[in-house]
A protein has these predicted regions:
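WD40-repeat beta-propeller superdomains and closely related acidic/aromatic-rich repeat-like regions
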Residues: 1-351
């Protein structure tokens, strides 16, 4: 442990059960969490007050994502329900729309949701397909994944392409024309997580076999990064996409993604956590970040070039989610634990 001081939280609440998802509104005012029993908690960080809690679904919840521009968020459940909610100016939350998808008997759960960058469509992974819906809940397109269950989806930064991944590789569809044939990036194993670089030059995947696989999008040239002790689900870009942070070990692994790319180059590592890293989040300016591990330790780093974190804290159990406020210049960090603790931290002046 270095000489960094522990950062205190300025807000704390019990979610009542393990968290299923955590996310900030685009304006940075509200942070919302939903637990596995579908109880929703919305905190107004401007006043420090929590809005009235409610049950979003009759069954278990799996995901929650805010719209990239509006005070609107979406929740999903095990039975294929998708509900859209809006926070009004009077701090009352009401339901905008509700749909239920039954695409695949026995696997209708929806745990992956992702808004198109411009907010015009929501991508929903269900069974062996990805469905695009409007903000109003109207289904506008559907893309199939031949490899079976969709494990991950990711939008190209410009928003015209949608990557769908699972067993056998990645299928990249043109969201503007559902009739176009997909671009297929084949891989022999199962993909669990997916991310585009901020410039769209690379698409990277965390794999079942404890590796990270990458493709250069233009040339389709691929490469593999190995040496992970666990599944590297965390794929987080810093320094305007010049570096990629990955989990999969107790050390933070930093891969170079400059013009030369990572092929044939050794990554840098940062030793701080004693247990496997299970959450990584980057600030809105893309420079500072936080990492969390299985024993509840959170480290806050000012730069990927620093060898030690600037501050740290410890939750009561495994770190489940970490998210920074997307508001410009904001340094508010939200964190949840396996036991259902939600805490907010202000790292202003630290990072």
């Amino acid at each position: 442990m270095n000489d960094a001081k522990k950062i205190p939280s300025f807000y704390e609440t019990d979610l009542g059960e393990a968290p299923a998802a955590l996310n900030w509104s685009s304006c940075g005012r509200w942070v919302a969490a939903i637990n596995v029993n579908s109880s929703v908690m919305v905190v107004d960080t401007k006043t420090g007050n929590g809005l009235k809690r409610w049950i979003a679904h009759e069954d278990g919840a799996l995901a929650l994502v805010w719209h990239p521009r509006l005070p609107v968020f979406v929740t999903s459940s095990l039975k294929g329900e998708i509900k859209t909610w809006k926070v009004d100016v009077d701090q009352i939350v009401h339901k905008l729309s509700e749909i239920t998808l039954n695409r695949d008997s026995g696997s209708n759960w929806i745990e992956t949701l992702s808004w198109r960058p411009d907010g015009k469509q929501l991508a929903i992974a269900t069974g062996s397909s990805a469905i695009l819906c409007s903000v109003k809940g109207d289904i506008e397109a559907e893309f199939s994944f031949p490899g079976g269950t969709v494990a991950a989806i990711a939008w190209h930064p410009r928003g015209s392409l949608l990557g769908i991944a699972g067993y056998g590789g990645v299928y990249i569809y043109n969201a503007l024309d559902s009739g176009d044939e997909p671009i297929v990036l084949k891989w022999k194993g199962s993909i669990l997580s997916l991310s585009w670089s901020p410039d769209g030059a690379f698409i990277v995947a965390g794999c079942q076999d404890n590796t990270v696989h990458l493709w250069r999008f233009r040339s389709r040239q691929d490469a593999q990064m190995s040496g992970f002790a666990y599944k590297p689900l965390q794929l987080t870009w810093v320094d305007r996409g010049k570096r990629l942070l990955t989990g999969g070990t107790s050390e933070l692994v930093i891969w170079p993604f400059d013009k030369k790319g990572p092929e044939g180059r050794a990554p840098q590592t940062r030793a701080f956590h004693e247990h496997a890293i299970c959450a990584i989040a980057v600030t809105s300016n893309g420079k500072s970040f936080a990492s969390g591990c299985r024993n509840g330790r959170i480290a806050i780093w000012k730069s990927s070039r620093d060898t030690e974190p600037k501050t740290w804290t410890t939750l009561d159990s495994r770190v489940e989610q970490l998210h920074w406020s997307p508001a410009k210049q904001s340094k508010l960090l939200a964190a949840t634990s396996r036991q259902g603790l939600l805490q907010l931290f202000d790292a202003s002046g630290i990072v």
